[in-house]
């Protein structure tokens, strides 16, 4: 993959250095193109009208300068999709379709996750600007692109930039696999700054935003960043959605393994819905992270539906 400096076309206007009657016949018609770079800085360049027309460059396009110093459209999305098609595996696509029901079958290319992670590293290294173009593009037509998007977000090292991209991406997540792949490492290092967003996500009525918020509590707030009051956040969720309740049960089962004394009252005092309560006990008893005595005690806390 080639490395480019990527710009966004903000405005295209006529070059006013010559009036219509003053332009010599042998002088090419030019346009003034206003660009912004990935950091938001603005610059203006002159480009031949016919080049802009032939290359179908319009305001809002992502572009780069070719070897002749002329603007060229940056087709990162097409390039990524073509590369993913090259890694397609129909057997794996069939398997993924079974794991994620409700998603249109044609959205699955079947790219394997290890291959996606390797490709994400290559993409981030060779074309950082291209990554930014891709991350600003949603929704994606392919499930594989959503997974790649989540993996790329996980590698962003600046908290504010990562949080902004996550916020923009969350409304487009439509399955548990992409939701659970999205685990930005920078969030673990910034749990205090992240907490207000986690509280907002957990309270969301949208299935996968809520699931993501509970997943953040599970991943980043049961160890050093733990506080007993955080246990109340998932308990306050009232949902009939399987993928929300399943994540809540996983959260409390993990909390039992890591923070038993603070968590067990939620079962002793029936603070959870019956389904989440019993599923929590099931998952905890299947775990190797709690003792046999604890498992036996949990068995006695099961509730009838």
Regions found by a protein language model. Give the residues of each.
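Alpha-helical scaffold domains
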Residues: 76-305
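A generic structural signal for short beta-strands and their flanking turns/coil linkers
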Residues: 3-5, 29-31, 41, 61
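Short acidic, glycine-rich loop/turn motifs
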Residues: 35-39
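Short aromatic-glycine-enriched beta-strand elements
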Residues: 16-34
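Short, charged beta-turn/beta-strand-edge "cap" motif at the junction between a beta-strand
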Residues: 66-75
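Short coil-to-beta-strand transition motifs
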Residues: 1-14
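Beta-strand/loop nucleic-acid-binding surfaces
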Residues: 41-55
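Loop/turn positions that initiate beta-strands
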Residues: 58-64
